[in-house]
Amino acid sequence: MSSIIKIKNLTFSYSAEEERKTLDNVNLEIEAGQWVALIGHNGSGKSTLARCIDGLLMPESGSIEVDGLHLTEETVWDVRERIGMVFQNPDNQFVGADVEGDVAFGMENRGIPRAEMQKRVKEVLEAVDMTAFAKHEPVRLSGGQKQRVAIAGVLAVRPKIIIFDESTSMLDPEGKRDIVGLMRRLNDEENFTIISITHDIDEASLADRVIVLNDGRVIDDDVPGKIFASGDLLTKIGLDLPYPEALKEELKEKGIDVPNEYLDEEGMVDWLCRSALKN
């Protein structure tokens, strides 16, 4: 599969006085249709990298290519047409008086004909299960519902890539499950390229690939099973382990033999059930 994002020797600083770079010689490629999770502690460079990919920040050196376009000041608006971003606080993205008006806003800016806009608003509200709230004011929605509306607004302009920048961090557990499930569906069924920037290790474990950033550098890049099976790396940089791995560590401390390979929650439950039957 071809790479939809190519980043070479990317360097960025917020000021010349910084002792270290916010992004320091980052190199990576992301394939079309992948769900990639970017993880790292606060200040590791995750959100800065996302903003560079979208052209909200311009790197001081290196190059970014998105869907065959080299990102420059001349091409930035063409690049942004290929990318949708969903931020941590959806209130900062709302501009419409009601839900359907907010979803339509991005299309209005692109000059999409009214009949086509109405068609897309209906389609994307159905896709995120928010049709019943079309006439509601966004401020009166729950956190999870607000994020669904923000996602609908992104879907309406039909990008190829969706970046979720800490989009679940302010949600309750139910809202978080809903949005992560929607990410999965958009990736599996609609083939969107998903980039999820998150502190939630359990969310990251559901991605196709996990990239670990620390102090502006990529320090690991692999499938979730291999990243989380080597838990020492994560704990050294201040990250938690996914729940199944944390449970395995507790069982080890009690002298119980556990599998070496990474287990997701379903795999952990299966292993516990088999172990109980043997005993």
Q: Locations of the language-model features?
A:
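Catalytic Walker B motif of ABC-type/P-loop ATPase nucleotide-binding domains
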Residues: 162-165
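Conserved ABC ATPase signature
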Residues: 137-141, 145
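Conserved ABC transporter NBD signature motif
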Residues: 62-70, 79
